[in-house]
């Protein structure tokens, strides 16, 4: 019953938005792509040794406890390269900007890109062109929620979001000016 109410409301709002849309021919579509290198938060030799010791003592290696899972991740991350290459894209469709980031982007990061974009409207697509884990802000790293714990799903340097924000805003700036300079 409740789902029917919600579905009808969504349908009505969608219909009104569609009906009131301004359609136009010949909308310009442009795109800029850049790849940037970001650091990997690697464990120290002591952290790896402690993780291996914990795993050696695990009661059931097939059913690890949470701290043992993170120990396993510490060992795995030690084998990662020191940097990873991350593909970023920015598209312009008319006055709309679209940013594609291969991470689970925190809301505050997407909102910052939207608010600082030189284009009239901008939205962010997360988990695009790959997967590089969570993308917390430096402030979130300081708070230390599970999304920041070093693992295969959170391994980028603590300043990764800052670098991604600045790079995508530069890309949107290129698109807003209608030039192709600065893109790959």
Name what the model sees in each region.
Residues 1-184:
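Non-catalytic substrate/cofactor recognition surfaces at enzyme active-site rims
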């Amino acid at each position: 019953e409740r789902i029917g109410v919600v579905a009808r409301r969504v349908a009505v709002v969608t219909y009104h938005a569609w009906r009131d849309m301004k359609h136009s021919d010949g909308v310009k579509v442009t795109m800029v792509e850049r790849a940037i290198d970001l650091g990997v938060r690697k464990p120290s030799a002591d952290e790896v040794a402690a993780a291996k010791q914990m795993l050696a003592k695990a009661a059931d290696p097939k059913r690890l406890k949470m701290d043992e899972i993170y120990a396993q991740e510490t060992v795995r991350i030690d084998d990662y390269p020191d940097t990873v290459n991350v593909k970023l894209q920015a598209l312009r469709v008319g006055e709309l900007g679209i940013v594609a980031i291969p991470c689970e982007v925190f809301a505050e990061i997407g909102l910052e890109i939207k608010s600082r974009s030189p284009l009239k409207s901008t939205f962010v697509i997360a988990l695009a062109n790959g997967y590089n884990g969570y993308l917390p802000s430096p402030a979130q790293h300081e708070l230390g929620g599970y999304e920041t714990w070093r693992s295969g799903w959170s391994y980028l340097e603590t300043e990764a979001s800052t670098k991604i924000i600045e790079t995508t805003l530069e890309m949107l700036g290129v698109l807003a000016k209608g030039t192709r300079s600065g893109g790959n």
